[in-house]
Amino acid sequence: MGKGTLYIVSAPSGAGKSSLISAMLERNPTYAMKVSVSHTTRNMRPGEEDGVHYHFVAKEEFETLIAKGDFLEYAEVFGNYYGTSRVWIEETLEKGIDVFLDIDWQGARQIREQMPKAKSIFILPPSNGELERRLNTRGQDSAEVIAKRMAEAKSEISHYSEYDYVIVNDDFDTALMDFKAILRAERLKEEKQAAKYKGMLDALLAE
């Protein structure tokens, strides 16, 4: 059995990254795929579940994990730690399961340095106008917050060229097909196929 592939997925807020990852998992139940769940020291919010949205841990435990080198990357945001578990990702990949890692461009850089075989995907909105419309449609944020998110989006988008693949999420179903095509192509690479079909290949080449 071959190893799984780590997919780094980045996008500005409102580009549809989370929806695409969720749809990929729901519509392709035969694919061995999981989403990486980050560790955090922030308090759990209503509706969140430990181990599903985040692994909620105490600050002391998080700092112990840092000292042990258990994180591929971590950052402190507004006084709370967030980190990606190296151990969980490596164990999952060893089982032949692909892992999606939803992370920003800065975290993506850190991950690529440590796991150069990871594949990276950047998801773009079709226009600034459409991105702003999607953010407004959520109905969650004030005009001030949306303006801030739009500025952050421009900064995030400026790093799209650092990624292996780029998907434009104009039509959701088309973007989802593009997403699946990337996974399919990666699974058909020689290295993956040679591991998957080792017995068959040995038989084909036997004298």
From Swiss-Prot:
GO terms for molecular function: ATP binding; guanylate kinase activity. The keyword Transferase applies. GO terms for cellular component: cytosol. Pfam families: Guanylate_kin. ATP binds at residues 11-18. It is found in: Cytoplasm. Its EC number is 2.7.4.8. It is an enzyme of class 2 (transferase). The keyword Kinase applies. Residues 4-184 form the Guanylate kinase-like domain. It catalyses: GMP + ATP = GDP + ADP. Belongs to the guanylate kinase family. This is Guanylate kinase. It comes from Vibrio parahaemolyticus serotype O3:K6 (strain RIMD 2210633). The lineage of its organism: Bacteria, Pseudomonadati, Pseudomonadota, Gammaproteobacteria, Vibrionales.
